Amino acid sequence: MAIIKRVVRSKAGQAPVKKGAKIKKASYDSSRKKEVGVSDLTLLSKISDESINDNLKKRFEHGIIYTYIGYVLISVNPFRDLGIYTDDTMKSYQGKNRLEAPPHVFAIAENMYYNLKSYNENQCVIISGESGAGKTEAAKRIMQYIAATSSTHSESISKIKDMVLATNPLLESFGCAKTLRNNNSSRHGKYLEIKFDAHFQPCAGHITNYLLEKQRVVGQIKNERNFHIFYQFTKGAPEEYRQLFGVQQPEQYIYTSASQCTAVENMDDVEEFNETLNAMRTIGLTKSEQDQIFRALAAILWIGNISFVENEAGNAEIRDKSVTTFVAYLLEVQEELLIKALIERIIETTHGAKRGSTYHSPLNIIQATAVRDALAKAIYNNLFEWIVERVNNSLQAFPGADKSIGILDIYGFEIFEHNSFEQICINYVNEKLQQIFIQLTLKSEQDTYKKEQIHWTPIEYFDNKIVCDLIEAKRPPGIFAAMNDAIATAHADSDAADQAFAQRLNLFTTNPHFELRQNKFVVKHYAGDVTYDIFGITDKNKDQLQKDLVELLSTTSNSFVREIFPDQPQTDSRRRPPTSGDKIIKSANELVETLSKAQPSYIRTIKPNDTKSSTIYDDQRVLHQIKYLGLKENVRIRRAGFAHRQVFEKFVERFYLLSPQCSYAGDYVWDGETLDAVKLILQDASIPTTEYEIGVTQIFIKHPETLFALENMRDKYWYNMAARIQRAWRRYLQKRIDAAIRIQNAIRGKSGVSTFRNDELRNAGDKVYGGKKERRNMSLLGLRGFYGDYLSCNESKTRGSYIKRQANITERVLFSSHGNSLHAMYGGASQRLRKTFILTPTSLWIVGHTKARNAMKYITDYRIDLGKIRSISVTNLQDDWMAVNLMDSPKPDPLINLPFKTELITRLTQLNPRIHVKVSSTIEYLRGPKKLFVVKSQYSDSAPKYHDLYRNGTILVRHGNPPDSTAENRPAFNNEDMYGNLMEAKHKTMKKKVGTKRTPQALPTSSLAASAAQAAYHPKGIRSPTSTEQKSPSKSKPITKTRKPPVSSPVRNTSKTISNSKVYSAPKASVTKRTQDTVSVSKTSVKDDVTQEKNAIIQTEEKQNYSLPENIPQSSQTDSYQAAYDFPGSGNPSELPLQKGDIIYVSKSDPSGWSLASTLDNSKEGWVPTSYIVKYNGNVTDPSAQHQDMNTMKIQEDNTTSINEPETHTNQGPSNTDLGANLASVLAARANKLRSESEEDISREEDDDDDW
């Protein structure tokens, strides 16, 4: 048993000392789920767009949305809440590296924060993907993790963290909107920097805004919405705002109702409006500032309700002047100036350096509507920029905030039916991000291989620099430069500017990534070809508010409006003002420069479908994204040299269990260099050297299958350790069961109850063949009993009970045993298969054995109703074959080979007397319907000595005992003889281990047998009488003609001979006087005892010496004896209680260990334990010195015949009863020997690997 082994081993040497303080102890992750697909695309066996898509789809269908490509995270939008952003989930990623937890956005955040603290380098995460793929959600989760993970020790730090988190709902309200593809689409780009102090606590922040889609303010396509804030404000505005600003429901405003979508499923605008107000308060916006913000929003909504009619001259006029009156009230300007600005345009002419004339040109309805929308867009754009700047002021950096983590959340790549200036700007920025992604990824890989001195082959990839130059270049001019030239040529006329731009596009026709079509042009982006409309594109690029509107807003008495429009028109400046294209190019290049200064992380988001369904995975849609995101190229780059790499410490921490030299009982014990530990692990795991390379600080593994093999071996380590503990525990339980059975047998023997209760069944077995079949030697032994349930199926926690459960057997088992069944194969061949045969009161079960996943499974092959058995066919020779002939069964008749066939047949005939037993030289049975097969039998000297041989339909067997042979009589020996010495040896072992002096104690009132049973079930709960010093049990020497008295020996006799007579041990007590004959006990180990007992048993079996000792004169009835111990008795009236020192007469000694005694006055008589009394010679005698005489007396009473005086027997030779008794003793000894050897073999097998 494993527990004993560890105790023994600890005597020889202590366990290795734990080493490697940096290496964490390995632990079994019970929460680990079964891997779906691969968690890292670099581990795919085949690299293709289709295999990547299949892996992502498989994980998406199982609710797993995150996958790695090395350190790049792939995120598939689930369109539902998966419950994976809880506080417990966050805690599970804290302090763990990428391989220690499943892919997750929290793992990216943890890696950035760890690198910030460890290497003191700025970090950034680039989140890319198309609209609706989940970029904004990923950014929010990163901010959530960093705020929760970074420690907080002051109120100011906590306030900054709250303010950083509050920017999310605020900027989402003003910068996000519902589109056809996404309910919360970012219509602007932002780069949020969270800055940290020297203690790596967030102490400041800064937001950079990129290109707000202001066109959405004045118009949206059907089923899309304006920015969220308009619907939140119109639905959730308090009564105060409704009175001051005239706020109505969104259906009352053209800007919020024209697209016929004012509500979004699963979005509560009123609740989100309250969150927006809370975010404003958290950031520090005052009540006055909030009022001014909502006043401007109300002005925008009412501006949208200004409508025009055509007058008689064909010019525009205000349809309802009450609307313009209210707008003038909100903007705090004069109504007349507002109306003029909307329906007239001021035109100035110049003559050289002289001032020219000024004209007021009336506008038509289309032109007036454009001016109205331009005013609304300008107010909202400037309001949004003011909010961003106000947030940055609140997040003002404290001194020492020089390190940061940047989070880029920018609009994704867009392809619509009609694409204009906004789309080319958005797609240009994504091209720049794709360019920096490729450059930084390749650069990072190259730097890693160079630093680690690893050689690799560069991989080819598409460099989209040519597309970026096509859009942003100045010499030769790109698309934006051509657009600026067209505007400068025809500044006042938008149509003329569009035509001039179309002409300049002819310069790009030679570019392979450009195509010019009628009134349209195509740019072949990395994400796909996009067709842009030329009409109106130049006007959107101007980014200038008309002079009329600027002058109007400059007259306002509202300080907030003047604040958001600070710039005054420069009428005398001849320098061309920057266009929107110029601004976006400048912002994109600044962004690239900022990202290049930080250590980047990447999140690539994917949108699974266009219907926002949580169950649909559109393969073609995702395949397109996989291609334009370049995931296949990214995988190839990552795997160009090696599929997996890890620093030495983390590799050892993960796999040190695979090396016995590095681990002991789950602890890391290697005290050498970590590099040497890496080499040992790879060597002990049998990983070929061609599968890896070792760098300076990292181990590089070439193929994913190698990593899979390492992970599989690590997983099996825990399984093997659990299985080993289970085996040890089962052995321990089985030992207790065996001990209980031995004690029960001893109790039954002492009480006169026969251990063998199946004598009548055994005798019936002699008659079952009718004297026609030869018998085996083992079948005729007197010790042979029909025990029935040999597999202990009716017991609990046994293999038999496990088989019974597997076969779904619910009845009580009458017979169970292992055997074989002949299975007919195609072509006439046959195969012997191992089976288990179980007999119940109604059925015969044949259970097959099947091995699956290194575990044995038991499946029912046959369930035969006893009433369906017609006959049993056996041969007339001593073989073990029998055929069960069935009645009208579609299945073939079973042909069985079973050592206990006679017992099974006997039980079958008793349960169903109509079963006929056919004994013949052949066995006939049906192999199939109407397919009779005959098995012959014949003698053969080539057959095994104790078995038979089946060959080509013939049973070969040796000659057996005559058919009329009957079994020997049951041996008349007591079970206590067999097991008594074993229990005594156990007590001796315990006393040797303890080694402390104890005074003799009286036995408890319960009987000795009951005490022994208690000791078996509770080994530590019983204390037997012990002595201070013990003598080794003396050994009887081989019998000679002149008998020598037994002599005590200080050392156990190592002679290879042993007498057949039993030496009964008795409890020993401490003595007050030592004689010269007594010898001090030898401190012999338990192992020596077992070895000598085994040698003695082996010698006995070799010599087959069944001799009995010489007769010894019987003791007279008047012999006097003295009580050596107190014997209070168990309360049985047949016992005679004694106190130590009492003198008694002994008239009879029984082999069971009891003596019939009486007091000196013959007033009381009863049974006393023989081992508790010694021969009385008139002095106080040492009990130990008398025990040999008592044993001699018992031997004399046990054996009524001496081999030295055979003439005294009536029959020549030993009787059957005496021979059976001695043979039974030898068989019992052999059984104990085999059991001991089996246990030692099991222990020997686990000595090498018992490291748990």
Swiss-Prot record:
What this chain does, per the entry, is described as: Type-I myosin implicated in the organization of the actin cytoskeleton. Required for proper actin cytoskeleton polarization. At the cell cortex, assembles in patch-like structures together with proteins from the actin-polymerizing machinery and promotes actin assembly. Functions as actin nucleation-promoting factor (NPF) for the Arp2/3 complex.
Q: Which family does it belong to?
A: Belongs to the TRAFAC class myosin-kinesin ATPase superfamily. Myosin family.
Location of the protein in the cell: Cytoplasm, Cytoskeleton, Actin patch
The species this protein belongs to is Candida glabrata (strain ATCC 2001 / BCRC 20586 / JCM 3761 / NBRC 0622 / NRRL Y-65 / CBS 138) (Yeast)
Segments for region (Actin-binding): 404-486
In terms of PANTHER family, this protein maps to:
MYOSIN, MYOSIN-3-RELATED
- One Gene Ontology cellular component annotation? actin cortical patch
Modified sites of kind Phosphoserine: 357
Domain Myosin motor, chain residue ranges per copy: 36-715
Q: Domain (SH3): give its ranges.
A: 1116-1178
Residue span, TH1 domain: 773-963
- UniProt lists compositionally biased (Low complexity) regions at 997-1016
Q: Name one GO molecular function term.
A: ATP binding
Could you identify this protein by its name?
Myosin-3
Q: Where is the composition biased (Acidic residues)?
A: 1238-1252
Any Pfam family matching the protein: Myosin_TH1
Q: Which GO terms describe its biological process?
A: actin cortical patch localization; actin filament organization; endocytosis
- UniProt modification remark: Phosphorylation of the TEDS site (Ser-357) is required for the polarization of the actin cytoskeleton. Phosphorylation probably activates the myosin-I ATPase activity.
> What gene name is listed for this protein?
MYO3
Binding-site positions, ATP: 129-136
- IQ domain ranges (all copies): 719-739, 740-767
User: Which ranges are annotated Polar residues under compositional bias?
Assistant: 1050-1063, 1106-1121, 1203-1219
